[in-house]
Amino acid sequence: MLGDHGSGYWIGRKALRAAAADLDRRGPSTTITRGVVEALGLPRGCTVQGLIGKTKELRPADVASFAQIVLSAQDDKIASIILAAGASELVTTVRSVGAEHVILAGGLLAPSTSHKYQRPNTLRAMVEDSLGGCTYASHPVVGACWAAGRLRGVELHKVDLMNALEVRSDSRRR
């Protein structure tokens, strides 16, 4: 992968590295470790070798799923460092494009009520505070259509776009 800094995969990889460093006693203790160990189905008191063995099987989407552990542990010092770095990376990416208005999409930036752990979304708050003027779209396609309409001076409603997207995807399943 060439980029995707601050993404779920990026944060998930940082979580795995933090857990490995904790288990190996090369890094600080973090509550992320417990979440990673449980998610991988490893026994308590496992070794870093056990963790490494399990991570060899992981697909990118599996790695990205560990980002939720970091979001749920945002009071943990290491988790807050990872989230701050992720937010900084996302902001840097957006600023490099020079966009006037940003549409956030994706699970990590979803409102906190849609997260498994029901915690305030610190990552999203950090990104919004740095950029200002952000809009959230529940699906990237909705955000892209909304932005395209805005560029052309056409007002599109995100809810209508999302409903159209759902209808279209349902018809393909039949």
Q: Where are the language model's segments positioned?
A:
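Glycine-rich phosphate-binding/hydrolytic loop that grips phosphoryl groups
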Residues: 114, 122-174
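Glycine-rich phosphate-binding loop plus the immediately following alpha-helix
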Residues: 1-42
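Short glycine/serine- and small hydrophobic-enriched flexible loop segments
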Residues: 13-21, 72, 146-150
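Adenine-nucleotide phosphate-binding core of ATP-dependent small-molecule kinases
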Residues: 47-100, 137
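Short, mixed-charge aromatic SLiMs
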Residues: 34-46, 92-93, 163-174
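A broad detector of short, well-ordered amphipathic alpha-helices
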Residues: 10-13, 84, 92, 142, ...
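Glycine-rich phosphate-binding loops at beta-strand->alpha-helix junctions
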Residues: 83, 95-127
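Catalytic-loop motifs flanking and including active-site residues across diverse enzymes
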Residues: 7-12, 62, 66, 123, ...
